[in-house]
């Protein structure tokens, strides 16, 4: 019980600090159709903290039965993150699960990947999943344009780091949101995220969810 109380006290303090220090504005984000609450994350496939968070996002979101919406935010100082994001989008076109699995695969092997060997890792994943890679995965730049649109959205929201994680509620505009500011302890991060989802569900409980349509959301846990 003492340990639980300490964690609870620390959680409240962290949430308060996060609310006070948050610089990003998630009010322009929207939940996907059919969802009252969603976890929305701006990620960079070369970011170590994104790798730590990736499985946690799906674990907590699945437990609360809310979708995860992934936004690409490749940082300029990372030499291969944009290329990896293009391939992630390519695998998304094959199936949502394949796109999720590719991201999980990249995050898992991130310490061994560099600009010079990225293509080898991509080819290995494609071979293991029996997906033939075309000579050019994005010949017209359409996948890159989607990535740049996500990055522009993040820039307008005032993002300063990855991952930037929001719990967003249906409503508005502006949409109700909470930014999750991570701490070193991932168990505490899980608790923070779960609490933010529960709080948002209470906040928007009486609001009707938007009608379902096809959208790019990610609900299953990545491998």
Language-model features: where?
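C-terminal cap of thioredoxin/glutaredoxin-like
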Residues: 123-223
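Bacterial N-terminal signal peptides
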Residues: 8-19
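Extracellular/periplasmic catalytic domains that process cell-envelope and extracellular macromolecules
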Residues: 32-34, 61-63, 80, 156-161
